[in-house]
Amino acid sequence: MGAQEIIRSIEAEYTKSDLPTIYVGDTVKVGVRIQEGGKERVQPYEGVVIANSGGGINESITVRRIFQGVGVERVFLLHSPAVASVQVLRRGRVRRAKLYYLRDRVGKATRVKQRFDRSI
């Protein structure tokens, strides 16, 4: 057994199998586990996926949303234990792999057209 196979077998234990297929431009709701005091709760974070990177256990998405007039971006490792759930709310129609140009846009210009040919 080579080193790559050993790494894959260890990673297979930690990968989540219930994740939906996420594309750039999709609007998603990510449930993030937060520890406050001795309690744990799940906080939803909703926004547009502007970047998708990595593969396997290192797969991550960058989600952007506008909060109180300020753009906020968070990077989520999809297979992390801190990510409780990922739900696709709507599919977006875009022609780019990275939507970094949305950072320079304000108001209604940041909207992404909806895509109807992919199921949610």
UniProtKB/Swiss-Prot annotation:
Entry-linked InterPro entries: Ribosomal_bL19, Ribosomal_bL19_CS, Ribosomal_bL19_sf, Translation_prot_SH3-like_sf
GO cellular component terms given for this protein: cytosolic large ribosomal subunit
Family (UniProt): Belongs to the bacterial ribosomal protein bL19 family.
NCBIfam families membership: rplS_bact
Molecular function GO terms recorded: structural constituent of ribosome
Organism in which the protein naturally occurs: Synechococcus elongatus (strain ATCC 33912 / PCC 7942 / FACHB-805) (Anacystis nidulans R2)
Gene name in the database record: rplS
Name of the protein in question: Large ribosomal subunit protein bL19
Task of the protein: This protein is located at the 30S-50S ribosomal subunit interface and may play a role in the structure and function of the aminoacyl-tRNA binding site.
